[in-house]
């Protein structure tokens, strides 16, 4: 019985997206799902600091999906997930460089050790086939990214976060990695929801 609102937007420079907001139901206090796909002309070199092809910069394309979930039940944590891909175009309009980014994290109101351990174990299991150190690195990235300096603490109990990732031989493999990460997030979060929804 939730209400779902849809907001479509466009960007003058090129592209647009859709935002869905879910609320006023039995489960969500508020939930937002954002889709975006944009394109444009040459980027400033500052935006290309970590790519190899600064000199080949005739345009760009970027796409992303983000999710933020605020359940009504305080025993179920807030969660956040986003995936994104960025491509640089050459003078013929072909993608000549690309990278991916994303991650997910968990913010409990009433922390349960079982949920936190399971959350991190699922992330570690997902990442192990891609590299022995990825979980450690991505988990540290998440902790640093969501650090709140003036409070000397971090937001929530962590997760994984990465940016400018190009550890794949093709863009298709990079996209497959993002898809697998999104599925891991959904499955891991649903485990917690099922465990706590009647608390």
How would you describe each model-predicted region?
Residues 1-51, 170-199:
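Gly/Pro-rich turn-and-neighbor structural signature
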Residues 2-4, 75-76, 135:
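Short secondary-structure capping/junction motifs at helix and strand boundaries
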Residues 7, 53-57, 132-133:
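N-terminal start-of-chain detector that recognizes signal peptides
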Residues 7, 33, 74, 102-104, ...:
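Flexible, active-site-adjacent loop/turn segments at secondary-structure boundaries
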Residues 17-100:
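Internal mixed beta-strand/loop scaffold within catalytic domains of large alpha/beta enzymes
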Residues 91-198:
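Long, contiguous internal "core" modules enriched in hydrophobic/ aromatic residues
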